């Protein structure tokens, strides 16, 4: 699916279940979660009671940093799958690259973790495998050692954070780009240029940001627990951003970024 529903910071329990149900009601079929979000169980309950057949759903989860390595990743996957109440997962990602310390060591860690994903894929427990927050210098050594190349790279992507180098690398290697935080922070939604462009199309700034991701060949994963915003974020297929406006958005100064750099994170 070309549009997904993100669940980062989505509360566990009824609020989360209601949010996923609302997303399913509004046509989302791609639900993105992760072991680190602590809400896989909630997502699983919502899917089981959401009234949508399994074959129509596309479910993503991710292995966390403390479970890197071959055996630990296989164990972590089974824990995630049990919480989600699924026979298989549609997409499994390495959440963050190992990138600290000696280069040879972190490259080996990523390669061993990837080998576990390849095993899950070949065993039919995962339909697609990929990475998250990987830059080209993380991807290249992993790809050199891989039997199966990454199919997806999920990165922070929004106006003011256009990740051109990583997107171009992924496009060259047929790696699908997914966009977490496609709306950026509140500063993105308050940017006057984006407000003016959105007004010219009769859409909200949030819709403009999501549409920009789509037209930049990325799959946006907007998140919300507000029913109205969940619905609004799905209504992005009725307009096209012109090439001129796409370029104006591309050229925004850095804006609304999370500050999370895969080369320097310490979690």
Predicted segments with their positions:
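Short, acidic/polar
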Residues: 11-24, 69-84, 137-140, 162
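Beta/alpha (TIM)-barrel catalytic core signal, keyed to glycine-rich beta->alpha loops juxtaposed to Asp/Glu
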Residues: 12, 97-267
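A short, structured active-site edge motif that brings together acidic residues
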Residues: 54-67, 88-97, 156-157
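Active-site mouth loops of central-metabolism enzymes
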Residues: 3-14, 63-70, 101-106
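Residues at the N-termini of beta-strands
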Residues: 30, 88-91, 128, 152
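N-terminal binding-site loop/beta-alpha segment at the start of enzyme catalytic domains
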Residues: 1-57, 116, 265
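Acidic (Asp/Glu)-rich catalytic clusters
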Residues: 44-54, 81-86, 143-146, 167-173
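CE4/NodB-like, metal-dependent polysaccharide N-deacetylase domain
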Residues: 73-94, 119-123
């Amino acid at each position: 699916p070309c549009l997904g529903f993100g669940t980062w910071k989505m509360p566990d329990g009824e609020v989360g279940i209601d949010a996923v149900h609302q997303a399913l009601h509004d046509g989302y079929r791609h639900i993105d979660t992760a072991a680190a979000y602590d809400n896989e169980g909630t997502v699983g309950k919502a899917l089981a009671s959401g009234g949508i057949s399994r074959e129509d759903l596309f479910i993503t989860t991710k292995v966390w940093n403390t479970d890197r390595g071959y055996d630990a990743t296989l164990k972590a996957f089974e824990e995630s799958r049990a919480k989600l109440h699924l026979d298989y997962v549609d997409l499994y990602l390495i959440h963050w690259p190992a990138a600290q310390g000696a280069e040879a060591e972190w490259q080996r860690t990523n390669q061993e973790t990837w080998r576990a994903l390849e095993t899950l894929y070949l065993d039919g427990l995962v339909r697609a495998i990929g990475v998250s927050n990987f830059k080209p210098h993380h991807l290249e050594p992993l790809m050199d050692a891989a039997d199966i190349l990454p199919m997806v790279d999920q990165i922070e992507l929004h106006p003011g954070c256009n990740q051109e180098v990583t997107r171009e690398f992924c496009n060259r290697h047929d790696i699908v780009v997914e966009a977490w935080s496609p709306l950026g922070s509140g500063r993105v939604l308050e940017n006057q240029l984006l407000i003016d462009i959105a007004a010219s199309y009769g859409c909200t700034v949030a819709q403009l940001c999501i549409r920009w991701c789509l037209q930049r060949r990325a799959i946006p994963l907007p998140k919300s627990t507000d029913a109205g915003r969940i619905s609004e974020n799905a209504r992005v297929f009725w307009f096209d951003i012109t090439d001129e406006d796409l370029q104006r958005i591309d050229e925004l100064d850095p804006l609304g970024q999370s500050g999370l750099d895969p080369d320097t994170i310490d979690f």
